[in-house]
Amino acid sequence: FSNQMLASLAEAIQVSTSPKEKSKNKDIFYWAEGSLAFGKVRETDTSSKKKIYTDGITIGADKFTDDREIKGLAFRYSQNDVKVGIDGSRLDTDTYNLTYYSTTPVKDDKRFLDAVVGIGALYSDISSVLDGNKLTGNRNGKQIYGTLKLKEEIKKDELTLIPAAQIDLGYTLLSSYSESGKTAMRFDKQSIQSRNLRLSIASVETLNNKKYKMKRHGKIEYRANLHRSSNIKYSYISDSSTKYDTELNSGALHNINGEVGIDVIYDDNFSLFFIYELNEALGKGYTQKIHLAIGYLPQKNTNFAFKIEAD
Protein backbone atom coordinates (compact mmCIF):
# COMPACT_ATOMS: atom_id res chain seq x y z
CA PHE A 1 0.00 0.00 0.00
CA SER A 2 1.15 3.53 -0.72
CA ASN A 3 2.22 5.89 2.03
CA GLN A 4 -0.61 8.21 1.10
CA MET A 5 -3.32 5.68 1.95
CA LEU A 6 -1.81 5.00 5.37
CA ALA A 7 -0.86 8.57 6.23
CA SER A 8 -4.20 9.65 7.65
CA LEU A 9 -6.92 7.22 8.63
CA ALA A 10 -9.26 9.88 9.89
CA GLU A 11 -9.08 13.63 9.99
CA ALA A 12 -11.71 15.99 11.29
CA ILE A 13 -11.47 19.32 9.50
CA GLN A 14 -12.90 22.65 10.59
CA VAL A 15 -15.83 22.41 12.96
CA SER A 16 -18.18 25.37 13.31
CA THR A 17 -21.33 25.39 15.39
CA SER A 18 -24.01 28.04 15.74
CA PRO A 19 -27.49 26.69 16.53
CA LYS A 20 -29.88 29.63 16.34
CA GLU A 21 -32.39 28.56 18.96
CA LYS A 22 -32.13 26.51 22.10
CA SER A 23 -35.31 24.69 21.10
CA LYS A 24 -33.44 23.27 18.12
CA ASN A 25 -30.71 21.66 20.20
CA LYS A 26 -32.31 18.21 20.02
CA ASP A 27 -32.94 18.23 16.28
CA ILE A 28 -31.09 15.87 13.99
CA PHE A 29 -29.60 17.48 10.90
CA TYR A 30 -28.83 15.41 7.81
CA TRP A 31 -26.19 16.25 5.22
CA ALA A 32 -24.39 14.83 2.21
CA GLU A 33 -21.13 15.61 0.45
CA GLY A 34 -19.40 14.48 -2.74
CA SER A 35 -15.68 15.09 -3.12
CA LEU A 36 -12.72 14.82 -5.48
CA ALA A 37 -9.03 14.89 -4.59
CA PHE A 38 -5.96 14.53 -6.76
CA GLY A 39 -2.28 14.98 -6.14
CA LYS A 40 1.30 13.87 -6.65
CA VAL A 41 4.02 12.34 -4.48
CA ARG A 42 7.58 13.17 -5.48
CA GLU A 43 10.05 10.40 -6.29
CA THR A 44 12.63 9.66 -3.58
CA ASP A 45 15.68 7.42 -3.24
CA THR A 46 13.51 4.60 -1.88
CA SER A 47 10.15 5.05 -3.65
CA SER A 48 8.78 5.88 -7.09
CA LYS A 49 6.67 8.92 -7.84
CA LYS A 50 2.92 8.53 -7.48
CA LYS A 51 -0.18 10.11 -8.95
CA ILE A 52 -3.25 10.00 -6.71
CA TYR A 53 -6.93 10.37 -7.56
CA THR A 54 -9.78 9.94 -5.08
CA ASP A 55 -13.52 10.46 -5.38
CA GLY A 56 -16.12 9.73 -2.75
CA ILE A 57 -19.51 10.44 -1.26
CA THR A 58 -20.35 10.94 2.41
CA ILE A 59 -23.74 11.03 4.13
CA GLY A 60 -24.19 11.91 7.77
CA ALA A 61 -26.42 13.06 10.60
CA ASP A 62 -25.60 15.52 13.40
CA LYS A 63 -27.39 16.08 16.70
CA PHE A 64 -27.17 19.05 19.07
CA THR A 65 -27.51 18.27 22.80
CA ASP A 66 -28.65 20.44 25.70
CA ASP A 67 -25.00 20.90 26.74
CA ARG A 68 -24.12 22.44 23.34
CA GLU A 69 -22.38 19.23 22.42
CA ILE A 70 -22.61 17.92 18.87
CA LYS A 71 -22.63 14.23 18.03
CA GLY A 72 -22.69 12.74 14.57
CA LEU A 73 -22.47 9.61 12.48
CA ALA A 74 -21.21 9.47 8.90
CA PHE A 75 -20.82 6.81 6.23
CA ARG A 76 -18.32 7.32 3.42
CA TYR A 77 -17.59 5.39 0.23
CA SER A 78 -14.55 6.34 -1.82
CA GLN A 79 -12.50 5.10 -4.75
CA ASN A 80 -8.74 5.62 -4.50
CA ASP A 81 -6.55 5.19 -7.58
CA VAL A 82 -2.76 5.42 -7.26
CA LYS A 83 -0.41 5.18 -10.24
CA VAL A 84 3.13 4.23 -9.23
CA GLY A 85 6.18 5.06 -11.36
CA ILE A 86 6.13 5.02 -15.15
CA ASP A 87 5.90 1.29 -15.94
CA GLY A 88 2.18 0.82 -15.30
CA SER A 89 2.07 -0.26 -11.65
CA ARG A 90 -1.08 0.85 -9.85
CA LEU A 91 -3.23 0.34 -6.77
CA ASP A 92 -7.02 0.75 -7.03
CA THR A 93 -8.96 0.59 -3.76
CA ASP A 94 -12.62 0.84 -2.77
CA THR A 95 -12.94 2.08 0.82
CA TYR A 96 -15.96 2.01 3.15
CA ASN A 97 -15.88 3.92 6.44
CA LEU A 98 -18.37 4.34 9.28
CA THR A 99 -17.36 7.15 11.64
CA TYR A 100 -18.75 8.51 14.91
CA TYR A 101 -17.64 12.02 15.87
CA SER A 102 -18.39 14.60 18.54
CA THR A 103 -17.34 18.07 19.59
CA THR A 104 -17.78 19.16 23.21
CA PRO A 105 -17.23 22.59 24.77
CA VAL A 106 -14.91 22.35 27.77
CA LYS A 107 -14.53 26.01 28.72
CA ASP A 108 -16.84 28.97 28.04
CA ASP A 109 -17.67 27.76 24.52
CA LYS A 110 -14.16 28.80 23.44
CA ARG A 111 -12.30 25.57 24.06
CA PHE A 112 -13.50 22.32 22.50
CA LEU A 113 -12.66 18.64 22.58
CA ASP A 114 -13.21 16.82 19.28
CA ALA A 115 -13.35 13.03 19.18
CA VAL A 116 -13.49 10.68 16.20
CA VAL A 117 -13.70 6.89 16.18
CA GLY A 118 -14.41 4.70 13.19
CA ILE A 119 -14.08 1.43 11.35
CA GLY A 120 -13.33 0.78 7.70
CA ALA A 121 -13.02 -1.90 5.04
CA LEU A 122 -10.66 -1.91 2.04
CA TYR A 123 -10.91 -3.85 -1.23
CA SER A 124 -7.85 -3.45 -3.45
CA ASP A 125 -6.79 -4.45 -6.96
CA ILE A 126 -3.00 -4.47 -7.21
CA SER A 127 -1.03 -4.42 -10.45
CA SER A 128 2.78 -4.41 -10.39
CA VAL A 129 5.16 -4.29 -13.34
CA LEU A 130 8.67 -5.62 -12.64
CA ASP A 131 11.24 -6.02 -15.41
CA GLY A 132 8.46 -6.00 -17.97
CA ASN A 133 6.44 -8.71 -16.19
CA LYS A 134 2.93 -7.82 -15.00
CA LEU A 135 1.80 -9.24 -11.67
CA THR A 136 -1.77 -8.86 -10.40
CA GLY A 137 -3.60 -9.62 -7.18
CA ASN A 138 -6.51 -8.72 -4.91
CA ARG A 139 -6.20 -7.78 -1.26
CA ASN A 140 -8.70 -6.83 1.45
CA GLY A 141 -8.23 -5.00 4.71
CA LYS A 142 -9.95 -3.85 7.88
CA GLN A 143 -9.33 -0.63 9.80
CA ILE A 144 -10.06 0.90 13.18
CA TYR A 145 -9.04 4.46 13.99
CA GLY A 146 -9.52 7.25 16.47
CA THR A 147 -8.65 10.90 17.02
CA LEU A 148 -8.67 13.24 20.00
CA LYS A 149 -8.23 16.96 19.38
CA LEU A 150 -8.18 19.83 21.88
CA LYS A 151 -8.62 23.25 20.32
CA GLU A 152 -9.38 26.81 21.33
CA GLU A 153 -11.22 29.39 19.24
CA ILE A 154 -9.92 32.95 19.55
CA LYS A 155 -12.38 35.29 17.84
CA LYS A 156 -11.95 38.92 16.81
CA ASP A 157 -14.61 40.39 14.55
CA GLU A 158 -14.89 38.05 11.54
CA LEU A 159 -11.52 36.34 12.11
CA THR A 160 -11.06 33.22 14.23
CA LEU A 161 -7.69 31.72 15.21
CA ILE A 162 -7.71 28.07 16.26
CA PRO A 163 -4.62 26.61 17.98
CA ALA A 164 -4.95 22.85 18.47
CA ALA A 165 -3.22 19.69 19.66
CA GLN A 166 -4.24 16.31 18.30
CA ILE A 167 -3.35 12.63 18.54
CA ASP A 168 -4.31 10.02 15.92
CA LEU A 169 -4.25 6.26 16.41
CA GLY A 170 -5.00 3.64 13.79
CA TYR A 171 -4.69 -0.05 13.09
CA THR A 172 -5.04 -1.76 9.70
CA LEU A 173 -5.02 -5.52 9.09
CA LEU A 174 -4.43 -6.59 5.50
CA SER A 175 -5.35 -10.07 4.28
CA SER A 176 -2.96 -12.52 2.73
CA TYR A 177 -2.99 -12.71 -1.06
CA SER A 178 -1.24 -14.33 -4.01
CA GLU A 179 -0.14 -12.68 -7.23
CA SER A 180 -0.70 -14.17 -10.65
CA GLY A 181 1.95 -13.90 -13.35
CA LYS A 182 5.58 -14.78 -13.91
CA THR A 183 7.72 -14.64 -10.72
CA ALA A 184 4.52 -14.24 -8.68
CA MET A 185 4.71 -14.05 -4.89
CA ARG A 186 2.44 -14.90 -1.97
CA PHE A 187 2.09 -12.33 0.83
CA ASP A 188 1.08 -13.18 4.40
CA LYS A 189 -1.29 -11.11 6.50
CA GLN A 190 0.15 -7.71 7.36
CA SER A 191 -0.66 -5.46 10.31
CA ILE A 192 -0.01 -1.73 10.14
CA GLN A 193 -0.17 0.67 13.07
CA SER A 194 -0.24 4.45 12.90
CA ARG A 195 0.45 6.98 15.65
CA ASN A 196 0.59 10.69 14.93
CA LEU A 197 0.95 13.73 17.15
CA ARG A 198 -0.13 17.05 15.63
CA LEU A 199 0.23 20.70 16.67
CA SER A 200 -1.46 23.29 14.49
CA ILE A 201 -2.69 26.84 14.14
CA ALA A 202 -5.61 27.55 11.83
CA SER A 203 -7.41 30.73 10.82
CA VAL A 204 -10.96 31.19 9.53
CA GLU A 205 -12.34 34.45 8.13
CA THR A 206 -16.07 34.81 7.52
CA LEU A 207 -17.29 36.92 4.58
CA ASN A 208 -21.07 36.99 4.17
CA ASN A 209 -23.52 38.68 1.83
CA LYS A 210 -27.19 38.21 0.92
CA LYS A 211 -26.56 35.34 -1.51
CA TYR A 212 -24.01 33.18 0.30
CA LYS A 213 -21.77 32.66 3.31
CA MET A 214 -18.07 32.35 2.54
CA LYS A 215 -15.20 31.27 4.76
CA ARG A 216 -11.54 31.63 3.87
CA HIS A 217 -9.32 29.39 5.93
CA GLY A 218 -5.74 28.28 6.26
CA LYS A 219 -3.70 26.03 8.51
CA ILE A 220 -0.09 25.18 9.25
CA GLU A 221 0.64 22.01 11.16
CA TYR A 222 3.55 20.07 12.58
CA ARG A 223 3.02 16.31 12.56
CA ALA A 224 5.22 13.77 14.32
CA ASN A 225 4.83 10.37 12.65
CA LEU A 226 5.62 8.18 15.66
CA HIS A 227 5.16 4.78 14.00
CA ARG A 228 6.58 4.40 10.50
CA SER A 229 7.39 0.72 9.96
CA SER A 230 5.63 -2.55 9.18
CA ASN A 231 6.86 -6.05 8.37
CA ILE A 232 6.05 -7.76 5.06
CA LYS A 233 6.32 -11.56 4.99
CA TYR A 234 6.28 -13.24 1.59
CA SER A 235 7.55 -16.11 -0.54
CA TYR A 236 7.77 -16.94 -4.24
CA ILE A 237 4.97 -19.23 -5.39
CA SER A 238 7.51 -21.28 -7.35
CA ASP A 239 9.54 -21.84 -4.15
CA SER A 240 7.29 -21.66 -1.09
CA SER A 241 9.92 -23.27 1.16
CA THR A 242 11.94 -20.03 1.36
CA LYS A 243 10.31 -17.27 3.42
CA TYR A 244 11.26 -13.61 3.36
CA ASP A 245 10.64 -10.99 6.04
CA THR A 246 11.21 -7.36 5.09
CA GLU A 247 10.73 -4.29 7.26
CA LEU A 248 8.99 -1.52 5.33
CA ASN A 249 9.89 1.98 6.50
CA SER A 250 7.71 4.79 5.22
CA GLY A 251 7.39 8.49 5.79
CA ALA A 252 9.41 10.78 8.03
CA LEU A 253 9.37 11.48 11.75
CA HIS A 254 9.00 15.23 11.24
CA ASN A 255 6.38 16.61 8.84
CA ILE A 256 5.12 20.10 8.03
CA ASN A 257 1.62 20.37 6.54
CA GLY A 258 -0.06 23.47 5.16
CA GLU A 259 -3.41 24.18 3.55
CA VAL A 260 -5.51 27.05 2.25
CA GLY A 261 -9.14 26.87 1.21
CA ILE A 262 -12.50 28.47 0.63
CA ASP A 263 -15.94 27.26 1.75
CA VAL A 264 -19.06 28.78 0.18
CA ILE A 265 -22.59 28.02 1.47
CA TYR A 266 -25.48 29.27 -0.69
CA ASP A 267 -29.02 30.18 0.38
CA ASP A 268 -30.37 26.98 -1.15
CA ASN A 269 -28.10 25.07 1.28
CA PHE A 270 -25.70 23.80 -1.36
CA SER A 271 -22.07 24.28 -0.45
CA LEU A 272 -18.76 24.28 -2.31
CA PHE A 273 -15.39 23.51 -0.75
CA PHE A 274 -11.91 23.99 -2.20
CA ILE A 275 -8.67 23.11 -0.38
CA TYR A 276 -5.06 23.10 -1.57
CA GLU A 277 -2.82 21.00 0.66
CA LEU A 278 0.97 20.63 0.78
CA ASN A 279 2.56 17.98 3.02
CA GLU A 280 6.35 18.04 3.44
CA ALA A 281 7.97 14.94 4.93
CA LEU A 282 11.30 16.42 5.98
CA GLY A 283 14.14 14.66 4.21
CA LYS A 284 11.78 12.30 2.36
CA GLY A 285 9.72 14.31 -0.15
CA TYR A 286 6.42 16.10 -0.43
CA THR A 287 2.81 15.52 -1.43
CA GLN A 288 0.48 18.04 -3.05
CA LYS A 289 -3.30 17.60 -3.10
CA ILE A 290 -6.32 19.54 -4.30
CA HIS A 291 -9.69 18.78 -2.69
CA LEU A 292 -12.99 19.75 -4.31
CA ALA A 293 -16.34 19.01 -2.67
CA ILE A 294 -20.03 19.74 -3.10
CA GLY A 295 -22.23 19.45 -0.02
CA TYR A 296 -25.93 19.69 0.75
CA LEU A 297 -27.67 20.54 4.06
CA PRO A 298 -31.44 19.89 3.75
CA GLN A 299 -32.60 22.04 6.68
CA LYS A 300 -32.69 25.79 6.18
CA ASN A 301 -31.61 26.47 9.75
CA THR A 302 -28.61 24.15 9.72
CA ASN A 303 -25.43 26.04 10.53
CA PHE A 304 -23.17 23.09 11.21
CA ALA A 305 -20.68 21.35 8.94
CA PHE A 306 -18.29 18.57 9.96
CA LYS A 307 -16.15 17.28 7.11
CA ILE A 308 -14.45 13.93 7.42
CA GLU A 309 -11.84 12.39 5.18
CA ALA A 310 -10.66 8.84 5.72
CA ASP A 311 -8.08 7.19 3.47
Give residue ranges: language-model regions.
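Outer-membrane beta-barrel biogenesis signature
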Residues: F1-I28, P298-K307
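Membrane translocator/pore-forming domains, dominated by Gram-negative outer-membrane beta-barrels
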Residues: N25-D311
